[in-house]
Structures are given as C-alpha cells and as structure tokens.
Amino acid sequence: LDEPGRPAAHKEYQNARAVMEGQFPDEDRRWRKLLDYYFNCIRDNDQHLEAILNELDNLQLTQNTIIVFTADHGELGGSHQMHGKGSSVYKEQIHVPMIIRHPAYPGNIRCNSLTNHLDLVPTLIGLTGRDRSLREKVLEGRKGRDMSPLLAHPEQAGLNALRPGSLYCYGMILYMDAQYTAKFRKLAGEKLPHDQFKKAIASLHPDFSHRSGIRMINDGHYKFARYFSLKQHHIPATLAELLENNDVELFDLVNDPEENHNLAREPEKYRDLLMTMNDKLNQLTAAEIGEDDGSYMPPFEGSQWDLTAAQMHQY
C-alpha cells in the first residue's frame, strides 16, 4: 500500500475498514480464508438463483422471461493487498458480471463491448420491444445506452460499439478518513437516542483534504483515474493542474491486465497519453454527470462544494 504510485486513498480506506471490520494482517492463510468465505457466498447466491430458475421452469415461464444478472461491485479479496470494496478502481472491485438471457437469442456467447450501469435502464426499456417513439419518451432526459441491439450478434460487437468508455465515480465519506470512521463507530456503539445521535454525528468532521473522491474512465485499452479531495471538485484542463490536485493512475490494460504498473508515475514520458485520457474523462463526465461541482454531497457545517480553482488552495 506504500509503493510509489499508489494513491494514499488505498491505505486510508484499508485503515478505515480495519476500524469497521477489524485488523487483517497480510498473511496468506488469512487471504485464503477470506477467499474461501467469498467463494462460498457466491455459491450460496448461485443456489438461490438456481431456485428462481427452477421455479420459472415449474411455472412454464422460462421461454417467456428475460433474465438480467449483474452486481453492484466485486470483492478485492487480497488483490493489491486490499479487501472489501472502496477507494480503488481495480478490476476485482469494479468489473462486475452482466448476463442477459433472452429466449429469442442463443446463449453462451460473450460480448466484449464496454458497458456501464447507466445502460441498465435504457436496455431494460429496449428489451420490452415497445415502439421506438414510446421508448424514447420514457427515457427522455436519462443517460445511458441501450445494449439490447447487441444481443443479435454479441460476438461481433466491437469494444466501443456502445460507448467510448465506461465512467466510474466514487465519493464515500465514511471511509475517506480512518480517524473519522473510528469516531463514527464509537458514537454508533453508544446507542444514544436518535436525536442525540444525529446531533453528535453532525458535530464530526472528516478530513476533506484526503483525496478520496474518484473519477475514472476505462476505454478498453487504458484505465485512467484521478483521486481528489471531495472539497476540490474540478475539471483539470492541463497536466500541471491534473498533477497538482489529484493522485493519478494510468494502466495499460492490454499489456498490464493485472494493473500492477501505474504509468502516471512517469508523467512527462506519458504526457500525451495522460492528457488524452483526461480529455476523454472530462468529456464523458460532462455527458453523463453534467456539471461535476460536488453539489450532490451532503451538507456539513462550513462545507462548500463548488470551489473555484483559486479557492481550492485554501483546503
């Protein structure tokens, strides 16, 4: 976690998680036990899923039912010396399954096109088969792409057939500052009356200087992420601004699929690539988030989310 190029948010998250879940020494036997538990959770989930599928068969609904299977996150499970899911963009955490079973199409075919959870609603609407004008009316103003047209020949769809990249955003206050997490847990354990608990929690203030917010884009070849203070929402336009206000990761997913070598450690060598990916991230952020000014954040006493570049240096 202390290797050069690792964002400080990785270690801070693991420290905060230790507060909530307990210490987890870096020992092989402990990682094996964690993975054993995780795999058994998956097996248990599969058994419940199997029960649903069997019931569809019993009700003779299988050939009249579209099934969509996905998840909200994975488990780091020891990868990169991390566990849980939090302040990172590693594939073990954010690359989740997306399986669509449609009775009108053959199964067991993989599609390599990039998708995003924003695409779920447009896809579900697309799978209804209703008139296009009605679907467009229902989806008016919504973000995301309809992946249902790819079902006919998913193996033929290119990497960017649906979208130029997949956007990932993260900003979880509870895990941004381990000391804040410890104070939060202590208060939670005191079992105060609800009103007193709310007042006590409101008096706590995490250290917003920690760069725990994440904006990431995966274009299929490269994964680019910047970690920033949640009090410093901004759209970097230059390399200097990017490096000054962010911890940066850049992975070559073709030549480094395990994401072990952060190319952003050599910013001058990869200047052009960094700025290309930064521009892609900015464009996708504008398209799918809009004005990324932090206004979605909950209120804290004295907090101000939409900081200008000049104001950022005060924090």
Residue ranges and their predicted role:
Residues 102-105, 129-131, 153-155, 220-222, ...:
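Short loop segments at secondary-structure junctions
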Residues 36-50, 93-94, 115-122, 126, ...:
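A structural signal for well-ordered alpha-helical segments within the folded catalytic domains
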Residues 5-30, 243-245, 263-315:
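Long, internal low-complexity/basic segments
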Residues 77, 147, 263:
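Short clusters of hydrophobic/aromatic residues that line enzyme substrate/ligand-binding pockets
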Residues 90-92, 169-265, 308, 314-315:
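C-terminal, low-complexity/hydrophilic appendages and adjacent surface loops
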Residues 1-64, 68-114, 127-137, 244, ...:
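Active-site-proximal cap/lid insertion segments
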Residues 63-68, 108-217, 275, 293-301:
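Polar, surface-exposed loop/tail segments
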